[in-house]
Amino acid sequence: FNEGKYPYAFPNFGAARMGAPMNAFVRVDSDPVRLRSQIYEPDYIIIVDPTLMRGYNCFSGLKEDGVAIINGKEDMELPKLKAKQKVFVVPANEIAMRTIGRPLGNTALIGAFAAATGELKLDNLIEVVKKRFSGKAQEGNIQAVKEGFEFVSEAQTYGAKRT
């Protein structure tokens, strides 16, 4: 991590086909992460595919003051949450189509996560994108990170679609 922290990430999926629903977990700490179990009470959740919210409680265990970021549209139906929980619905796939030409909203979602939580700095995210991509892919992904960040920043400032 560029911010002096230790991340540990791992997926959890069954013996299913490519594209099937799955969970991924990330632990971040100021010390090396030794715990290797699933996360049952997350501080934050990011829902990349909102169709997973049908028939599955994606918000199960989200902490009292937790934050959820959902790749979706403003008019989507949201579950009832606890008073201090926040949900940001970000049109990440639309941002990605406009910036990189493909509906892969991951970089827009990580920008949104940075703005919603303060856990990551935008400048550091941009540096990571610069190291990971080159050419037009780099330019598009930098723009996607910025737009995801700005979308949530504006929602926090102006009370736009924030539930």
Regions from the language model: what does each represent?
Residues 1-163:
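Active-site cofactor/cluster-binding pocket
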